[in-house]
Structures are given as structure tokens and as C-alpha cells.
Amino acid sequence: MNTRHEQWSLETIKEVYNTPIFELIHRANAILRSNFPHSELQTCYLVSIKTGGCTEDCAYCAQSSRYQTNVKPEPMMKITEVLERAKHAIESGATRVCLGAAWREVKDNHQFDRILEMIKGITNMGAEVCCALGMLTPSQSEKLYDAGLYAYNHNLDSSEGFYKTIITTRKYEDRLKTLDVVEQSGISVCCGGIIGMGETTEDRIGLLHTLACRERAPESVPVNVLWPIEGTPLQDQQTPSFWEILRTIATARIVFPLSMVRLAAGRAFLSVEQQTLCFIAGANSIFYGEKLLTVDNNDMDEDTAMLNLLGMRHRPAFSRKQEQPCQSATC
């Protein structure tokens, strides 16, 4: 398990975030190289197995039934269709397949049974499986574990203070409780947030601090950049500067030396050169495929060309390192 190895205060994380950029990148890169094989990148493929019609009011989400967006509710995908998509992605280089469903929480019904079969099928193909299914009970989490689920995504989105301004239908403590349920069942936790929603730098630091104060660090920390969607309350938000994105990536790497730091939604905003800087600064995971739920992502062929250009290798599935993280102040 990726256990918490040192105490991080808000002030300490703030100092890291505000470090002069060359020093920040150097420190983050040294930590990355100390804990992961060089030039290795995890490629994850995301499948929206149940799109639209969610009852939650997340201000950033096109899948909420409360907003007038171009996303229409769709029935849950068939098992065979999901397995076909996963097989194609794995053949194209993906080593983790993420299954996302637009609903508030898991129900004990035939849909959950289908998800368990999807997990078993994809795991048998040799890929890690991650699910983002909302809140769940200990019993459901145990069933997911027994089916072979590798990781469970449940983002905190932002700091607890800012969270209240973007979501009212689910409490911050509900999200923390879900993380506890997942951890207790033995499933790895994937948890990060979104930048560019109107939050402050202190909110971004607060999110990292909340995660750093947990008993176990997340196995993966996705850093998403808001993709403003017409019809949502955040449709007019400005995209954060590249330097804000880079600082967030580097700080996450330093605070979570053994975690996968994922350059997630919003990567399509970045040039190959900017993405390269993010990889140097600690990002070692991306989403691979043209679509992320309801928003565009980089073309898979373009990503393959980028990896070849940079001399990067696909990180094999089930290859999480067991070494202890670097303990020195400078690594």
C-alpha cells in the first residue's frame, strides 16, 4: 500500500507550490525518477458505460439532469460492447481501463451485476480496471474487489470550502467516507480534483493537503483541467494558465512520491511541448483515447506519435512499485 510517509502542513505544501519554477520542476523530476522507471507512461482508457441523466448538481458536469446541455441520457452499455471497446484499447496500448457511470451511487441490481462481469472480463484481458460509480457500501466494495477491481476513482474535486460552491447534493464528508469504504475493502484509491472552476491557489493546496493527511496516499492522483461546457453553471470559466497546471502537477508529485500523477481531462488544451514539461515535472499517466466521458481528448494516433517522439514506453499493467519513497528533503 502507498502509505503516508511524512506529515504535510498547508504551509509546507504552499511553500512547495510557490517554489521558483526551475527548482520546483527539478525537485519533482528527481522524485519521479527515484520511484518509477524512467520514460514510462501509464495509458488509461475511459469508457462511459452509463451516460447522462445524473441527479447530482455538480456545476462542472454535462451529465447532470439539472442542466440543459447537449448530453442526453443513454441506457447502460452491454457487456459485450464494453469488452469490445476494452479489447481495442488494450491492443492499442492501454494498460488500464476505467469504467464510469453517471449516477449518484451504486445500486444492488442487475446493472451492478453487469459491471462485475465487465470487470472480470477486462481483468482477464490483462489490464487493470478502475471504476467511477459514485458512492457505494462496504458490501458492494467487497464484491468489486472479488471481481478483480484494481482501483476505484472518487475525486474530492477541490478543497472542502470551495466544494460547497460547486456541489450541494453530496457532502464532502460523503466523498471521504466513500474513500474509506474503498480502502477498507483492499481496492486502490484513485482520487484527485479539478482546477479552473474559479477556485483559488489555496483551494488547490487545500485539496492536496486533505489527501496528504489521509492514512494512505491515493494510488493515483488525477489532475483535471475544467472543460467549460455550455449549459452548465461553469460554462464561462476561463482555463487556468499552463504554469498553474504545471505547478499543480509538480506539487502533487512531490507530495505523493509513489502515486501515479495523471494528466487527465483538459490535456487537449496543451501542446506536445507543454505536455512534455508536465511529464518532466512528475505526471506519469494519461487518458488514452479520443473521448473523456462527454468531452474531447487527444487523438490516440497523435498520442502514439508523441510517445514515440519522446521515447516513452507504456507502463505495464499491475506493475506498481513496492520501494519506499525518497525521504530526503531534496531527493
Curated annotation (Swiss-Prot):
Record's cofactor remark: Binds 1 [4Fe-4S] cluster. The cluster is coordinated with 3 cysteines and an exchangeable S-adenosyl-L-methionine. Binds 1 [2Fe-2S] cluster. The cluster is coordinated with 3 cysteines and 1 arginine.
Pathway: Cofactor biosynthesis; biotin biosynthesis; biotin from 7,8-diaminononanoate: step 2/2
One of the Pfam families matching this protein, by short name: Radical_SAM
CDD domains: Radical_SAM (cd01335)
Residues reported in the UniProt entry to bind [4Fe-4S] cluster: 54, 58, 61
Catalysed conversion reaction: (4R,5S)-dethiobiotin + (sulfur carrier)-SH + 2 reduced [2Fe-2S]-[ferredoxin] + 2 S-adenosyl-L-methionine = (sulfur carrier)-H + biotin + 2 5'-deoxyadenosine + 2 L-methionine + 2 oxidized [2Fe-2S]-[ferredoxin]
Domain called Radical SAM core: residue spans: 39-264
Subunit comment: Homodimer.
HAMAP family with a match to the protein in the record: BioB
Name of this chain's protein: Biotin synthase
Organism: Chlamydia felis (strain Fe/C-56)
Lineage: Bacteria, Pseudomonadati, Chlamydiota, Chlamydiia, Chlamydiales
